[in-house]
Amino acid sequence: MSRSEILFANAQKHIPGGVNSPVRAFRSVGGTPLFFKHAEGAYVVDEDDKRYVDYVGSWGPMILGHSHPDVLDSVRRQLQHGLSYGAPTALETEMAELVCSLVPSMEMVRMVSSGTEATMSAIRLARGYTGRDSIIKFEGCYHGHSDSLLVKAGSGALTQGVPNSAGVPAAFAKHTLTLPFNDIDAVAECLAQVGKEVACIIVEPVAGNMNCVPPAPGFLEGLREQCDKHGVVLIFDEVMTGFRVALGGAQAHYGVTPDLTTFGKIIGGGMPVGCFGGKRAIMECIAPLGPVYQAGTLSGNPLAMAAGLTTLKLISRPGFHTELSDYTTRMLDGLQQRADAAGIPFVTTQAGAMFGLYFSGADDIVTFADVMASDSARFNRFFHLMLEGGVYLAPSAFEAGFTSIAHGDKELEITFAAAERAFAELKKA
């Protein structure tokens, strides 16, 4: 038995399913999940000492690559002063100032401890600000595991084939209206009927939890227009896209300004953290200034702030995001060429340093239906073949992939060699 098999068997004795987040269990792709013990640069190393080119990047935040020395040094320096105080620090103010300077739509920001907490708090804030109860989300978009958002969610929920979670009261779900992603006509029709009841629209500007589906031309602009028309708060969930699609996030890349924005662990260099922020008039509704309560003992914890400040400063250098995007384009072009040569129906999508891989004969992937029509069984086989070739992809056909600035020509060679073998094997099947 491999070390991962032994560790997984032991983990299942005391951890439900042997994992602390469902997608890690490999239920979608089959087999035993890998247990990792080390990561550096573009690579992760499992408990059997096998190295893999990593296209998961801890689900997005490792934009500098793993174990960047400057980030580690910043954490070591902070460690000498303590782990957490449960009190204000200069670091969190510096982080808030930096985030607001990089993302102009964010006039004020509140730190939290996860992306789920950020989206949950942003929705509560939108409800408190508007005095309305209903929210609109989109099919296949995942915004964390808070009760009101586990309705036709993407990510692990798609992987398991369960659109809703047990334990979510019907009274919660009835306030969540779910519409087709990239369908602005459906949004306009819905708001024409119930706009006075809707507090907010929350959207991933690039849907990163049904793999990677960029917005259709005019979709985000249409959301902004409809929200303005009906007095609805527009929330961009940029937990995945923030500081990755562009320095100012997807909102900068696509030129559409939301009212509120949520970010995740990238602002902590991969440590547990998140934040939400936006217009001052809305943010001043949060306690202690306003009636909307939100709190957290570890919010703005100094280790995450130290790591995040270093990360954001490093990715702010001119040309950083162009390099990231160029690598991603080269990688996807190479995969497409090899799939075409093998006669395998295959489509890729890209938004900056995010990407999607679909075994599909469609010309493009635009809707939730397009995603669900792709061949997930073939992806599962591809995943394991790539793993054998030393390439670690997300263990689900419905999760986006991520590149880092540490990926380069050597990693392309490994990726392309593994892909050639994988597509050849798929052709035989």
Swiss-Prot record:
Coiled-coil intervals: none
Cofactor(s) of this protein: pyridoxal 5'-phosphate
Modified residues (N6-(pyridoxal phosphate)lysine): 265
Pathway: Porphyrin-containing compound metabolism; protoporphyrin-IX biosynthesis; 5-aminolevulinate from L-glutamyl-tRNA(Glu): step 2/2
Pfam families per the UniProt record, alphabetical: Aminotran_3
EC class name: isomerase
Catalytic activity annotation: (S)-4-amino-5-oxopentanoate = 5-aminolevulinate
InterPro entries associated with the record: 4pyrrol_synth_GluAld_NH2Trfase, Aminotrans_3, Aminotrans_3_PPA_site, PyrdxlP-dep_Trfase, PyrdxlP-dep_Trfase_major, PyrdxlP-dep_Trfase_small
Subunit structure: Homodimer.
HAMAP family: HemL_aminotrans_3
PANTHER family: GLUTAMATE-1-SEMIALDEHYDE 2,1-AMINOMUTASE, GLUTAMATE-1-SEMIALDEHYDE 2,1-AMINOMUTASE 1, CHLOROPLASTIC-RELATED
Protein name, entry field: Glutamate-1-semialdehyde 2,1-aminomutase
